[in-house]
């Protein structure tokens, strides 16, 4: 008697932001290489996951909500999508649920799934920043997450200390992209030319750009008034171009606006220094070897909350990974033209600040190494192992 073929392994993935969509797509690609036609994907994702064959439950743009007031206004819709997504997981009964970033949404789904079907293994790809604030989340996650895939090398130890679920460092996706971040010989000459390229990165969301662009422009104006010569480039994405152009209209010095990811990377490869809003971009700049000054401004309510919640000495991701505060940060009321301009002058010249950053950035390859395996491969290995093991 012939035995029937093994049923397909079903994996349910949830990614509600573009960065998570890219991670999900890379993970799906490796899982398909491992399982061939024996895998079926369901879930929520964006355009890149769709290219790997995912039919999303709803467009992720429905959750592109920024700002406290907007979130409150859209709360009934958000809660409905959480319920509907959890119901879809429970109906599918997958061999694994992989939640990717966006913890305010994905963790609520995971908790509902675990409460109603504890047999479904749950993997969390991208740790919440519990090492920075609300550390108690680690123990809470123990109740509904079986394994965390960390992007940062210090995260497994943080989970161990905080009593959270098992966490493995799989590597940041940026380490798979070093070739596009680092200059060739000709680009290195441009990076070291007499007229240095200064990058300005005011944020990747409209609200972030509006919080930073005016003060950044004023700081650059001061720098120019002091006689400092530089070429200014401002990388952004197509959907943010109008916001950027509106913001720089009153700038005393006009930047060249660079549109798109490939063009941004080309600008990174020739840049001498940067002024950036704190975020993932600081790690991108550091891996590219670009000394920087960082700033961070938010609304008054958010600032009030963050001041009482933050438990790390620096909010700069690159500083946290390096383990040393080499990059200056100007937060909230310290984010002023008067303070930013002198710091920018230092990173544009051969100063101690600039040299310290360059030396620290040279250590990142070793600090962030994942051996000879790509992050997406390591992530897929753990998802498959968790599926085989089932619920602990």
UniProtKB/Swiss-Prot annotation:
GO terms for molecular function: lipid-A-disaccharide synthase activity; phospholipid binding. Transmembrane segments: none annotated. Disulfide bonds: none annotated. It comes from the Bacteria. Coiled coil: none annotated. Pathway: Bacterial outer membrane biogenesis; LPS lipid A biosynthesis. GO terms for cellular component: membrane. It is an enzyme of class 2 (transferase). Its EC number is 2.4.1.182. It catalyses: a lipid X + a UDP-2-N,3-O-bis[(3R)-3-hydroxyacyl]-alpha-D-glucosamine = a lipid A disaccharide + UDP + H(+). Keywords: Glycosyltransferase, Lipid A biosynthesis, Lipid biosynthesis, Lipid metabolism, Transferase. One of its GO terms (biological process) is lipid A biosynthetic process. InterPro entries: Glyco_trans_19 (IPR003835). Pfam families: LpxB. Condensation of UDP-2,3-diacylglucosamine and 2,3-diacylglucosamine-1-phosphate to form lipid A disaccharide, a precursor of lipid A, a phosphorylated glycolipid that anchors the lipopolysaccharide to the outer membrane of the cell. Belongs to the LpxB family. This is Lipid-A-disaccharide synthase. The gene is lpxB.
